[in-house]
């Protein structure tokens, strides 16, 4: 998709992929500069909503924004992923991280202060200069040669405090900065502490700054090993209830539960759950490079739709203003009537209500502008954006889909991502149907004496029991017939419609695997084949 994605783990360029990569990147940039940017500039979009996009915004790596109250483990989470300290890292139970830190790849380890960072054209942070020195003094880029950072960048944010001091003492609009990052990152991770769950008013306001970016949000319930299973259920329920009041979306947010640091678990009752949740989160993060172009395309479409709506609003206000007298009174009236104007424009141009900016914020911003200096509606600019949305985007989608098919599914490597991919600590290694794969003895043999006793109560004839008799025993597991049917096919190795004592023991073993919560294999692994049947089966490839 992007030039930095052109190398796989072995360091060799993918053949035939780079042309499509550059086409997608250049296509997105070209569409924005030729179609969307003129519309934004004509109606002061950048003053009301978001600064203009630059080349670095299209070419940068996928970014992850971490947000949470103080001491929820944001910085520790980054260290857990990288398995390495980074410049500017401070960890402790008190509010430690007081700055926004962009953790990015660099050939040498070091840090760049905010004022120098916003003048670097290769970094996607130039537009942050509008937040002033109060913010730039609390912003830095931490660079280090870490393999994880070759594929993604991570933004660490200051811990959110409670009280009025949180809002006043920073010297910059914290929520506006979060909103700026939210528009540009690929994933927003909200971290909560399971041991002291709380969503303060300040945190609620920060979450509301992510309005319109709901598809990027993931939730991590961290430090879950500090509570037992019963407490964890209560904490999870309280978290979902609290989030439901803050995030106005009908969809349920994905919550990952675990303990994301490289220390022993304090409570091991839910170890298997934590491992599965960590792998799910890793897979989500590893998918970001593959989906980066789609995300940027999606953000460009959302931006274009908002730019159109903004143009309709501004041009309507311009049209309603008198030429001579009563301008201030008319301005106040139009601002007051803005909700009605929204409804009118929705009907006139067949626009969804969800495409309109928030009324209250728009009213506050309009107070500072002279409506007579706004431009009238320019149909050609609107038509150019409509043509882009209708025709140009579809051709890019084809290129993106082709590139995604050629990319590896797990591009993020190194750090914690390598710790569970191979060897005995891979998720599910030696568990379920994989148990006994490394052992010489047949894994079913240890329980076979118990299964043999059952087998001989089922009236075997010539050393085998019929399907009818086997069914009587198998249905006692209360598993669905569809599952038992699959187990029968796997266990009946010679396909004679009957089970000998080894096949019956195998069937009971597979039932146990399913009852323990593991998935059944689609075909019988070689180590599960009964010893007396191994010669008759074809060797696995």
Swiss-Prot record:
<keyword id="KW-1003">Cell membrane</keyword>
<dbReference type="GO" id="GO:0055038">
    <property type="term" value="C:recycling endosome membrane"/>
</dbReference>
<feature type="binding site">
    <location>
        <begin position="68"/>
        <end position="75"/>
    </location>
    <ligand>
        <name>ATP</name>
    </ligand>
</feature>
<dbReference type="GO" id="GO:0005524">
    <property type="term" value="F:ATP binding"/>
</dbReference>
<feature type="modified residue" description="N-acetylmethionine">
    <location>
        <position position="1"/>
    </location>
</feature>
<feature type="region of interest" description="G5 motif">
    <location>
        <position position="246"/>
    </location>
</feature>
<feature type="domain" description="Dynamin-type G">
    <location>
        <begin position="58"/>
        <end position="289"/>
    </location>
</feature>
<dbReference type="GO" id="GO:0031901">
    <property type="term" value="C:early endosome membrane"/>
</dbReference>
<keyword id="KW-0965">Cell junction</keyword>
<feature type="region of interest" description="G3 motif">
    <location>
        <begin position="156"/>
        <end position="159"/>
    </location>
</feature>
<dbReference type="InterPro" id="IPR031692">
    <property type="entry name" value="EHD_N"/>
</dbReference>
<dbReference type="GO" id="GO:0030674">
    <property type="term" value="F:protein-macromolecule adaptor activity"/>
</dbReference>
<keyword id="KW-0479">Metal-binding</keyword>
<comment type="function">
    <text>ATP- and membrane-binding protein that probably controls membrane reorganization/tubulation upon ATP hydrolysis. Plays a role in early endosomal transport. During sprouting angiogenesis, in complex with PACSIN2 and MICALL1, forms recycling endosome-like tubular structure at asymmetric adherens junctions to control CDH5 trafficking.</text>
</comment>
<feature type="modified residue" description="Phosphoserine">
    <location>
        <position position="162"/>
    </location>
</feature>
<keyword id="KW-0597">Phosphoprotein</keyword>
<feature type="region of interest" description="G4 motif">
    <location>
        <begin position="222"/>
        <end position="225"/>
    </location>
</feature>
<dbReference type="Pfam" id="PF12763">
    <property type="entry name" value="EH"/>
</dbReference>
<feature type="region of interest" description="Disordered">
    <location>
        <begin position="1"/>
        <end position="20"/>
    </location>
</feature>
<dbReference type="GO" id="GO:0005912">
    <property type="term" value="C:adherens junction"/>
</dbReference>
<dbReference type="Pfam" id="PF18150">
    <property type="entry name" value="DUF5600"/>
</dbReference>
<dbReference type="GO" id="GO:0032456">
    <property type="term" value="P:endocytic recycling"/>
</dbReference>
<keyword id="KW-0472">Membrane</keyword>
<dbReference type="InterPro" id="IPR040990">
    <property type="entry name" value="DUF5600"/>
</dbReference>
<dbReference type="InterPro" id="IPR000261">
    <property type="entry name" value="EH_dom"/>
</dbReference>
<feature type="region of interest" description="G1 motif">
    <location>
        <begin position="68"/>
        <end position="75"/>
    </location>
</feature>
<dbReference type="GO" id="GO:0005525">
    <property type="term" value="F:GTP binding"/>
</dbReference>
<dbReference type="InterPro" id="IPR027417">
    <property type="entry name" value="P-loop_NTPase"/>
</dbReference>
<feature type="binding site">
    <location>
        <position position="498"/>
    </location>
    <ligand>
        <name>Ca(2+)</name>
    </ligand>
</feature>
<dbReference type="GO" id="GO:0005783">
    <property type="term" value="C:endoplasmic reticulum"/>
</dbReference>
<dbReference type="GO" id="GO:0051260">
    <property type="term" value="P:protein homooligomerization"/>
</dbReference>
<keyword id="KW-0007">Acetylation</keyword>
<dbReference type="GO" id="GO:0030100">
    <property type="term" value="P:regulation of endocytosis"/>
</dbReference>
<dbReference type="GO" id="GO:0002042">
    <property type="term" value="P:cell migration involved in sprouting angiogenesis"/>
</dbReference>
<keyword id="KW-0106">Calcium</keyword>
<feature type="binding site">
    <location>
        <position position="492"/>
    </location>
    <ligand>
        <name>Ca(2+)</name>
    </ligand>
</feature>
<comment type="similarity">
    <text>Belongs to the TRAFAC class dynamin-like GTPase superfamily. Dynamin/Fzo/YdjA family. EHD subfamily.</text>
</comment>
<protein>
    <recommendedName>
        <fullName>EH domain-containing protein 4</fullName>
    </recommendedName>
</protein>
<dbReference type="Pfam" id="PF16880">
    <property type="entry name" value="EHD_N"/>
</dbReference>
<feature type="binding site">
    <location>
        <position position="496"/>
    </location>
    <ligand>
        <name>Ca(2+)</name>
    </ligand>
</feature>
<keyword id="KW-0067">ATP-binding</keyword>
<dbReference type="GO" id="GO:0048471">
    <property type="term" value="C:perinuclear region of cytoplasm"/>
</dbReference>
